[in-house]
Amino acid sequence: MRPSTITGLSLLIALVGASGAVAADAKRTQAPPAEPTAVIAPTSSFVSELRFGLSAEDPWGPEGRNTSANLTGEILFAKPFTASDLFTSYFVPRPHVGGSVNFQGYTNFAYAGLTWTVDITPSFFVEGSLGGAVHNGDRNHFYTPPDRSALGCSPLFRESGSVGVRLAANWSLMATVEHLSNGGSCADNRGLTNIGARVGYSF
């Protein structure tokens, strides 16, 4: 075999060996692939709480003289955003919608607004809400039946206050007072003040 051929084969073997060594070194120094990490998204619900209960309709007014009672229901939605600390979060309200149906055919109404809930202890809380309501009550400025409240117009302003206790992780019980009036925007402004109790289920 010619010397040039032997030299060529030697160079080829040396190159192959060198490339193999480089590949081995690269394999040893290459960082191991990262383990796949499970991304857990925070659980949230569009609906925050459901409430239902009973109330006495305007017990000190015309519609309450016959012990008029209502069936009530309310949906509270999740807060639009969360605050970084607990105190600030109390100022972020939950939107709500609800309704009240009278068993004796007196004033029914539907409402919407904002609710602020403040924890006094882990089990005890207070809350307030503001909003508006539409109703089918008396709006006749000339004559109001003696058993009806003169509400003047629709919609009305609605305010409510509650005190409540958490019975379990998801269940709560609260006493609520609500008031509806037109704030003097109509000639008649008797208004309605209802008191009652509600049960809430949180998601």
What are these regions (language model features)?
Residues 128-160, 164:
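Outer-membrane beta-barrel translocator/channel fold
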Residues 80-85, 122-126, 167-175:
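Repeated loop/turn-to-beta-strand initiation elements of outer-membrane beta-barrel proteins
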Residues 1-43:
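Cleavable N-terminal export/targeting peptides
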